[in-house]
């Protein structure tokens, strides 16, 4: 697995799936999530206001991106309550993103760290990388089918 950090405009980044964290109780969007929502025609706000996705820990929802961007799929990951959020929550969210990418048989995944801007950038990036690597690890030594899962994780 290759894990790398890049600083790029989200909508111009070519990726099979971009994972974005959403806190529970989110009613307004900011940062990249607001920009992505505008590109998707407001679907993220509609999903949040309808209650179909609440941002609770463990929740996930895949949306499909517009044709004119490099964003093929958008994965909303529920982060739970902001006051209970810590580095372990980042690990779990990144791990869930990797498992969804593997379930969809995607070869790579990008994880946006924009939702974590109130936290230390270095420790957040490290926790996301740890969660992704731990979720992707599988014991394959004694297995005859050594197929690989998600092999490339990019954090934005």
How would you label these PLM feature ranges?
Residues 1-156:
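Short amphipathic alpha-helical segment within the helicase RecA-like ATPase core
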